[in-house]
């Protein structure tokens, strides 16, 4: 009893490749950072794309302590300066077209954007 293999005559249409897009946003100003994150998330919701985030990464606090007196004489007084760097990550499952649409978002000054695209692996 051997079974004849079934031949598929229908051609399968290739679906657009789904990519995993990781967007990393960094800034010293948390308000402008949150505004850009909100713009990206609303664009993803309007395009009906799966989005996770913004994931808040712990802040980096860079500190520098210097002497106030330039000559080194006098009372030992010190200035303490610090800079806080805020970071957010957004993960999106989408096609390449979403990245083109994302270019229309206005990014405020001082916000750095890093986009990493990976192919989503198909499950067997």
UniProtKB/Swiss-Prot annotation:
Stored InterPro entries: Ribosomal_uS10, Ribosomal_uS10_dom, Ribosomal_uS10_dom_sf, Ribosomal_uS10_euk/arc
Entry superkingdom: Eukaryota
Q: Secretion signal: which residues? A: none
Q: Which GO terms describe its biological process?
A: translation
Which Gene3D superfamilies does its entry note?
Answer: Ribosomal protein S10 domain
Which keywords does this Swiss-Prot/TrEMBL entry list?
Ribonucleoprotein, Ribosomal protein
SMART domains hit by this protein: Ribosomal_S10
Alphabetically, the GO molecular function entries are: RNA binding; structural constituent of ribosome
GO cellular component entries: cytosolic small ribosomal subunit; extracellular matrix
Record family assignment: Belongs to the universal ribosomal protein uS10 family.
Alphabetical list of HAMAP family matching this protein: Ribosomal_uS10
Full protein name: Small ribosomal subunit protein uS10
């Amino acid at each position: 009893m051997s079974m004849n293999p079934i031949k598929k005559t229908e051609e399968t249409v290739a679906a657009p490749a789904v990519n995993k897009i990781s967007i990393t946003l960094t800034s010293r100003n948390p308000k402008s950072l949150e505004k850009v994150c909100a713009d990206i998330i609303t664009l993803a919701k309007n395009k009906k794309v799966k989005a996770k985030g913004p994931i808040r990464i712990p802040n980096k606090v860079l500190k520098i302590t210097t002497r106030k007196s330039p000559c080194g004489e006098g009372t030992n007084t010190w200035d303490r300066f610090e800079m806080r760097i805020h970071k957010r990550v957004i993960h999106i499952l989408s096609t390449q077209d979403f990245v083109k649409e994302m270019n229309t978002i206005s990014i405020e000054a001082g916000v750095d954007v890093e986009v990493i695209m990976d192919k989503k692996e198909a499950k067997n």
